[in-house]
Amino acid sequence: MHVAIIGSGPAGFYTAEALLKEIPGVRVDIIDRLPTPYGLIRAGVAPDHQSIKAVDRRYAATAAADGVRFVGHVSIGSDVSMAELQQLYDAVVLATGAPHDRQLGVPGEDLPGVLGSAAFVGWYNGHPDFADLDVPLGHPGACVVGNGNVAIDVARILAKTPEELGTSDITKHSRDVLNLSRVTDIHLIGRRGPYQASFTPKEMGELGHLTRAQPLVDPAHLPPVDNDAALEPGLRKTVTHLRAFAATPPAGKPITVTFDFLTRPVRVEAVGEHLRLIVERTRLDGDVAVGTGELRGIDCGLIVSCIGYRSSPIEGAAFDDRAGRFANDDGLITAGLYAAGWARRGPSGTIGTNRPDGFGIAARIAAEVTPGGKAGGAGLDALLAARGVRATCFADWQRIDAAEIAAARPGSPREKLVRHDHLLAAGCAPGTPSL
């Protein structure tokens, strides 16, 4: 049986791993538009969270297994169509993640200086699409909209010293910009309260140990402490951190990270050379945030929206535009076509959540798909060669990996290559012309 998996992030690799266990003799091609594998492990997980990135060793073992190929630098739609893949493979799995930001939905969000978290995180993590992103850090104010871990990551990266980022794999171009940052007043804006936030304890706790930044919480935003006992353990730990922040006196640190709970963005205004985010105070009606009509403005140079992600539609695959993911019935889109991970369920859960997801899809393929003598990878190779597409393989990635590690500054695991041509040049085997 020949299976194509579109997307080389956690969902793609867990699905490939499961297919090897479920279907003897299966041949799996993991296809990605980037020259490099690992998806959000490489380009989404915060650069100062290296222990989380270590899961790529498991994926590398899958990529090196007999019957699995990584096929990078191939775009679905322009290099090969979905219809062609379905002709070549017995089953196709969409594991493309959710690479696009959800819109704030407020006037002025298209102004320069308003960024989505996918762009901002991609910028400091070395995603080639965002190597030239303009990140304005010349104003003291920065607003981060959202009450989840991505918002915490963004605030933490803005607040850390160069020394604190020294052991990370943050990119050189973003280090250079961050080192000149004038940001001193970071606002974390959430429309609901602490009990409704999606922060996890580890990420929250890190904010309390930054060299030059102090987290600030208005005690009035915290529910009565006796109510904490009814919370699930993780949320209770998070709220305990927030209570500690609220009780800590000012320490004279040059940067503050203010948690603006019960606050929602209304519009963005251009004021001279900077921005003003107009926000409305909210109140809770149950767990629903309701506007009070009380407005105020926060002056800033940068606004980063961290309110969720959407998958990218692919011609030939039914898409649920409202949910921002592929339309599917427990992973099945149509006969022989499946979705896994965020492409199936939307952006939820942890990296590990994708493992049972991938194993479930593999079990469905084993039960539902009959091998049809299709060409599989050999057919894809012939098609790409005829079109002049130079795909990367896992050996190419290993050369890129080695080049990045060799270029690392002291204390850092690697210096990422961030442009397609540099990645392709580094990945070429000796004697192979680069693009």
What role is predicted for each listed range?
Residues 11, 36, 150, 194:
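Conserved Rossmann-like nucleotide-cofactor binding loop
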Residues 1-6, 10, 17-29, 44-46, ...:
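Rossmann-like nucleotide/phosphate-binding core characteristic of flavoprotein oxidoreductases
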Residues 23-39, 164-165, 169, 173-174, ...:
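Glycine-rich FAD pyrophosphate-binding loop
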Residues 101-180, 321-331:
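Glycine-rich dinucleotide-binding loop and its adjacent helix/turn
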